[in-house]
Amino acid sequence: MPPKKGKQAQAAGKKKDNVDKTFGMKNKNRSTKVQKYIKQVQSQSDPKKEEMRLKKLEEKKRREAEEAERRALFNPVADQRVRAGVDPKSMVCALFKLGNCNKGAKCKFSHDLNVGRRMEKKDLYQDTRSEKENDTMDNWDEEKLRKVILSKHGNPKTTTDKVCKYFIEAVENGKYGWFWICPNGGDKCMYRHSLPEGFVLKTNEQKRLERESLEKQPKITLEEFIETERGKLDKSKLTPITIANFAQWKKDHVIAKINAEKKLSSKRKPTGREIILKMSAENKSFETDNADMPDDVTQGSAWDLTEFTDALKKADHQDDGGIKDYGDGSNPTFDIKKANSATLA
């Protein structure tokens, strides 16, 4: 059906009104602000058009929400894991592929679908180990060092906050590299192989300046250091050392040592060896009776241990702990009282 005349007249009037409002404006086709104003005027003059646009926008959002809900229900995604030594940004987010990731820039995985295609392919015709051997730590900066550490050791596997001392020593001494192995068990080391927070890698120039500053510092010998420390002492409270007082101190020291040994020997129980030696010293016939004894102890007559047994019984009746050793002292200690009580029981 042809449009009614009333509607045609109304549309023509609106069009004329729009032309009148924008008449005389400069730079209609150049200025973005003017174009924006013209669109605003046109939308105000035709409210149904703006209403249709908003309705389509709401319909589009509703369809997107339904599609996201359908994917979440029928296409579940398992937790995406990262292997040790792999940068998460080199992997495309699995939820982003399905359109369900709502983390945006905070997601640790990449939202670029071309990230996997841009990865450099490994050249099978070249051996890269020689390049790594020449790529020593002397040419690295702090950023390169952290990347190599992450590539070699991967994500930390331990819960301790302590950093491996061998790792720090290797980094500070410039011995760390691609082929460095931790002496504390290699990859099974229980401590962290990562730089502590606030660590700053010193450059070769800084190390050279430190060495020069150490070389410029005054050096003294051990004798000079001792004399310097002696000069700091308060001489009014000390006695100067002379030959006479040193000899007297040595004599007193020897006497005190002898008295301490006598006091200790009077308290402790004599060993079997000491009893034998004492008996041989007191009884001269003990040596003469055994002078004809053959060298081979497996051949010969039995010993008369009567005196030794009496000495043991005499020692057993004393108040202290009993004999603590036997023979030459190499045997384990034992308690005669405990042994006698065990035999009686």
Swiss-Prot record:
It comes from the Eukaryota. InterPro entries: ZC3H15/TMA46_C, Znf_CCCH, Znf_CCCH_sf. Residues 1-70, 316-345 are annotated as: Disordered. It is found in: Cytoplasm. Residues 46-70, 316-327 have a biased composition (Basic and acidic residues). GO terms for biological process: cytoplasmic translation. A zinc finger (C3H1-type) spans 87-114, 158-196. The modification Phosphoserine is found at residue 301. Pfam families: DFRP_C. GO terms for cellular component: cytoplasm; cytosol. Keywords: Cytoplasm, Metal-binding, Phosphoprotein, Repeat, Zinc, Zinc-finger. Its main location: cytoplasm. One of its GO terms (molecular function) is zinc ion binding. Present with 4220 molecules/cell in log phase SD medium. Interacts with RBG1 and with translating ribosomes. Belongs to the ZC3H15/TMA46 family. This is Translation machinery-associated protein 46. It comes from Saccharomyces cerevisiae (strain ATCC 204508 / S288c). The lineage of its organism: Eukaryota, Fungi, Dikarya, Ascomycota, Saccharomycotina. The gene is TMA46.
